[in-house]
Regions:
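Core segments of transmembrane alpha-helices
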Residues: 57-71, 132-141
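A cytosolic-side transmembrane-helix exit/cap motif
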Residues: 99-111
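Interfacial segments of alpha-helical transmembrane regions
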Residues: 2-15, 64-67, 76-91
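Juxtamembrane boundary at the C-terminal end of a transmembrane helix
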Residues: 144-149
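Mid-bilayer segments of alpha-helical transmembrane spans in multi-pass integral membrane proteins
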Residues: 90-98
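Interfacial loop at the N-terminal end of multi-pass membrane proteins
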Residues: 2-10, 14-61, 108-123
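Membrane-water interface of alpha-helical transmembrane segments
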Residues: 1-7, 51-55, 72-83, 123-129, ...
Length: 149
């Protein structure tokens, strides 16, 4: 496999993952904001449960990590823009684990009548989703720059 093909495949999966994250931040999050707090408290655990079982969601977020290992072994870090993009992808995923997962857990533990706490968690989730989408988008841009040179 050529380096260009390997980078193109990594870019495709990273773009698919970034697209999913952007969809969540720009379409699904506003829909969650329209829900009353009790409905949000029921919806978010269901969303999480379905997301972790989704072959698409898990695949597009996992394939780049798995593929990075042989990429770095074979091609090292000779393409700095591409490596920077992979680093941003890793940062976006790490941000998700640090920022989003605790929110999912807290919402699952809250009762539907804890309106103020649910409202605050929803606000935090919106911010976390936007940060994650922005970093994911930057990762795709950085990786794509490599193809311009």
């Amino acid at each position: 496999m050529t380096r260009t093909l390997a980078e193109a495949l990594l870019l495709i999966f990273t773009t698919l993952s970034a697209g999913t994250v952007t969809f969540v931040a720009t379409v699904l999050q506003p829909a969650m904001n329209d829900l009353d707090e009790a409905a949000f408290a029921r919806f978010l655990p269901s969303l999480y449960r379905h997301a972790v079982r989704s072959v698409y969601a898990v695949g597009t977020s996992t394939v780049p990590f798995v593929a990075m290992i042989p990429y770095f072994i074979v091609y090292k870090v000779e393409h700095p823009w591409f490596v920077a993009g992979l680093a941003c992808f890793t940062l976006a995923s790490t941000a998700s684990k640090i920022m989003n997962l605790p929110i999912y857990r807290r919402v699952a533990e809250l009762k539907s009548d804890e309106v103020a706490k649910l409202r605050e968690e929803r606000r935090k989730l919106q911010g976390a989703n936007h940060v994650r989408a922005l970093i994911s988008f930057v990762s795709v841009l950085l990786m794509a720059v490599q193809f311009a040179y």
